[in-house]
Amino acid sequence: MKRIVAAVLAVVMLVALSGCISTDNNIDRYGADVVKHGAMAFMPTLDSLGAYTDVDYFIRMDEGVFPSYSMRLIVSYGEAEFKAEVKRLETAYTYLQEPQTADYSDEAYYTMPLTEFSAAGFDFRVAVFEDTVYPKNFGMVGISQAMHKIAYLWFYSPDHDYICEADEDKAAQMTEFLNYHFEMDKLG
């Protein structure tokens, strides 16, 4: 009997600690998700996006012991509108100018290793906004000249302390971060 109780408790603890990860891509819930998860300072409203031809929305919610929320909005444009939106983005956001570091227990870490990088066909720039705390709450804007697309990525996790150690490949770690939290490697 004790073994059964111990086994049940072990399974319950494992499930509780591993958490529940869910994803959604229903664009009809986008506005409510932005408000619910506190992304209003960074994520654009659909009405502010100009004359787009398509929009792809994705949210990843990890509700476990160490929760995190990742929101991805990729907007497609015709050529002329794309050029206008890219120009607008130059002043729509303030962008990070230097990588961000932190020291924990005599070890150096990057809370934001790069200010600009390329991944998944997009050239990303890390944004600065009112509630930015790298890497706990931040956003990135990605531009794909080849596809005429703009990606808005927002991340929040109160428990995320750093993206990579000082001696790791910064670009590879940012790509890994994007693939894990935003599923950028699964884009068609």
Predicted features along the sequence, with ranges:
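C-terminal motif of bacterial Sec signal peptides marking the signal peptidase cleavage site
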Residues: 15-19
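Repetitive helical segments and hydrophobic/amphipathic motifs
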Residues: 11-12
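N-terminal export/targeting and maturation segments
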Residues: 20-88
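Extracytoplasmic electrostatic interaction patches
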Residues: 89, 93-188
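Positively charged n-region of N-terminal signal peptides that target proteins for export
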Residues: 1-4
